[in-house]
Amino acid sequence: MQETMFIDPQRCIGCRSCVAACRECSTHKGYSMIFVDYIDRSETTATMPTVCMHCVEPTCALVCPADAIKVNEDGVVLSALKPRCLDCRNCVNACPFGVPKYNSEIHLQMKCDMCLDRTSEGLKPMCASVCPTGAISFGKYEQIVPLRRTKPVNAHVFGNQHVETKVYLMLPTDADEVIVDGCGVFEGRVVTDGQQKQESWMDMQVEESDRNNEF
């Protein structure tokens, strides 16, 4: 199985080492493509890293009128191609996880591409290489999962919409679901280990993110 990322919210301590490291990635122009969010700011100080989930059927690419967002042979959803990007920001508004951000300085959508410049050379993404607690891991499914006491989940349910992702969330083994909203913060919607995608996410209304959609 191909290498991918595993996100374990229970291990995140909010140190933001991942954010600092992401800025150092040579293709990111000094911007971080990863965010650290509060799971439920009103009730806890628990945090979790938010990366691009690299959807199997990425809505950001589906809504792009210029075909500027590509998916490579390994299933990594890439940032928009500058010659094609129209500045329409459809991708920013359509992502159910609230990941893509619009860079107004260079007029381009930018997001996590799983450090393609590093992983293509056999290196871990910057965030996974510096995370002190293992909240962000990178490797093959059969290598990572047996070492954890948590359950990998990559099928997300937003109402009656199912979104399958390349990136896995690691959940407690006795939990069948975790609540998330449409912006990548764990509040208000359901994530389960369901297997089948059903309807197109584009049929759903996307909620406004409480994070800034621009750099």
Predicted regions located by residue number:
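Non-ligating segments of multi-cofactor redox enzymes
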Residues: M1-F215
